[in-house]
Amino acid sequence: MFKRMAEFGPDSGGRVKGVTIVKPIVYGNVARYFGKKREEDGHTHQWTVYVKPYRNEDMSAYVKKIQFKLHESYGNPLRVVTKPPYEITETGWGEFEIIIKIFFIDPNERPVTLYHLLKLFQSDTNAMLGKKTVVSEFYDEMIFQDPTAMMQQLLTTSRQLTLGAYKHETEFAELEVKTREKLEAAKKKTSFEIAELKERLKASRETINCLKNEIRKLEEDDQAKDI
């Protein structure tokens, strides 16, 4: 049964034990080089920093606001966005850390803090020449363990963000497959190296035992000669 926010009370309806809800998100930035320094301020790039849901859903169902803390050199460095898209677009010339804080509609749910290093440059020549957008984005998960009754309702009643195709700059599913393949290959390589080392160790032990037997035999021969 759907309840209005005021009906939950000051404790947001209390904690719902044994419930875990995971909300995957994507955060990061895109940047494009102007091609040269801008005469009026020396800025070289336009960039956008953002937080968005990994799945196609409207986060405003449970997110009250998202705060972006920019470098102090920007006017009004503390930017607040209260509805999707949760993003800030600016221009600049340098990279710096952006502190992102996600606040929830439920006042009893603690905010989530993310740290993102704004990326403007990369070694790719095409990107440096402005032919390609620089992308630096990451997958993360907000895990709500024993949420309040209010938060549980908010988290499970969100709607789709868009009716059209929904995708990210990075193909995370493809990246996950590639990462798993790399881990599997590394695991196989490590197993092979361990097996190889065990064989070497076994051969070394056999060599040592042979040498010990030869030494013992020589000692026994010397003792026999003395007699």
From Swiss-Prot:
Annotated region (Interaction with MLLT10), positions in chain: 163-227
The protein's name: YEATS domain-containing protein 4
Function of the molecule: Chromatin reader component of the NuA4 histone acetyltransferase (HAT) complex, a complex involved in transcriptional activation of select genes principally by acetylation of nucleosomal histones H4 and H2A. Specifically recognizes and binds acylated histone H3, with a preference for histone H3 diacetylated at 'Lys-18' and 'Lys-27' (H3K18ac and H3K27ac) or histone H3 diacetylated at 'Lys-14' and 'Lys-27' (H3K14ac and H3K27ac). Also able to recognize and bind crotonylated histone H3.
Alphabetical list of PROSITE patterns matching this protein: YEATS
Compartments in which it is found: Nucleus
Residue ranges the record marks as coiled coil: 178-226
Keyword Transcription regulation carried by entry: yes
Keyword annotations of the record: Chromatin regulator, Coiled coil, Growth regulation, Isopeptide bond, Nucleus, Transcription, Transcription regulation, Ubl conjugation
Species lineage: Eukaryota, Metazoa, Chordata, Craniata, Vertebrata
Keyword Transcription: yes
